[in-house]
From Swiss-Prot:
GO terms for cellular component: plasma membrane. It is found in: Cell membrane. It holds the Pfam family ABC_tran. Its EC number is 7.3.2.1. Transmembrane segments: none annotated. Disulfide bonds: none annotated. Keywords: ATP-binding, Cell membrane, Membrane, Nucleotide-binding, Phosphate transport, Translocase, Transport. This is Phosphate import ATP-binding protein PstB 1. The keyword Nucleotide-binding applies. It comes from the Archaea. Residues 1-51 are annotated as: Disordered. It comes from Haloarcula marismortui (strain ATCC 43049 / DSM 3752 / JCM 8966 / VKM B-1809) (Halobacterium marismortui). The gene is pstB1. It is a peripheral membrane protein.
């Protein structure tokens, strides 16, 4: 859960300047949680039946008079990595930001259609976006650690949500999950700004997972990193999918092929052209347009 600047490579898509994911101390009062969504029960059912955890139906998004997404029908499975690829301005980051309602921060944005998380339409009037963002964390393109210590960065969301019992253990667990603990365990009081870019991004991932969300959204999480740091992030994403549903936007098709289970291909005009198992998308796509894009004939 972050509150810093959000950026995107999709130059035609407006981006919110801040994430207002502040939390109330008592999550029991949040409308989303009051919908009686049983996380454990839902997870079990989804795992047994393959029911999607996120599902859009005829989803359309506009920025003023410009349509960014056109009638998107997409079902994202639980505890897998789903990649979204496509040329700049195709709407993939717009879709990502719809999932936890980050587009609410753009005045000109308008959303039509349905987008369900665990069976509940996230755009229903009784859904609190702040409560939604507690369960759907986000990691941005550029690392954005707070100007605080490494420890305080990870503890930030826990303190806001009044989850301070055993906080040291929770911070350690999050850092271990993010494959950062061994590198920072003896310098938790060090400023997060002194970390390398790759370490900062893993710290942001630790901060996001510390509050134990159900879904992690990632918008180009490795685009600003060197190849070694990128490899660590990719390995981490595959590990995170054992516990979380991961949705990643990437311009790097090789990255999508390496780490994702499912791939959605968006093309110019905000159209979802194909969604399937990643191997099938890259080896035998149904759409000629998708094949042309993947082979570099356009886009």
């Amino acid at each position: 859960m972050t509150e810093n600047e959000m950026t995107s490579n999709d130059s035609t898509e407006p981006t919110p300047t801040t994430e207002t994911a502040a939390s109330s101390p008592d999550p029991s009062g949040d409308p989303l949680i009051e919908q009686s969504i049983d996380v454990e029960g839902t997870d079990s059912t989804a795992a047994e039946t393959g029911k999607p955890v996120i599902e859009s139906s005829d989803l359309n998004v506009f920025y003023g008079e410009t349509q960014a997404l056109q009638s998107i029908d997409l079902a994202i499975p639980e505890k897998q990595v789903t990649a979204m690829i496509g040329p700049s301005g195709c709407g993939k980051s717009t879709f990502l930001r719809c999932i936890n309602r980050m587009n609410d921060l753009i005045d000109a944005a308008r959303v039509e259609g349905d987008l369900h998380f665990e069976g509940k339409n996230v755009y229903d009037a009784d859904v609190d976006p702040v409560a939604l963002r507690r369960r759907i964390g986000m990691v941005f393109q550029h690392p954005n650690p707070f100007p605080k210590s490494i420890y305080d960065n990870v503890a930030y969301g826990l303190r806001i949500q009044d989850q301070t019992e055993n906080i040291d253990e929770k911070v350690e667990t999050a850092l271990k999950r993010a494959a950062l603990w061994d590198e920072v365990k003896d310098q938790l009081d060090k400023s997060a700004l002194d970390l390398s870019g790759g370490q900062q991004q893993r710290l942001c991932i630790a901060r996001a997972i510390a509050v134990d969300p159900d879904v992690i959204l990632m918008d180009e999480p490795a685009s600003a990193l060197d190849p070694i740091a990128t490899s660590k992030i990719e390995d981490l994403i595959e590990e995170l999918a054992e516990e979380f549903t991961v949705v990643i936007v990437t311009h790097n098709m090789q990255q999508a092929a390496r780490i994702s289970d499912k791939t959605a291909v968006f093309l110019t005009g905000g159209e979802l052209v194909e969604f399937d198992d990643t191997d099938k998308i890259f080896e035998n796509p149904e759409s000629q347009r998708v094949e042309d894009y993947i082979t570099g004939k356009f886009g």
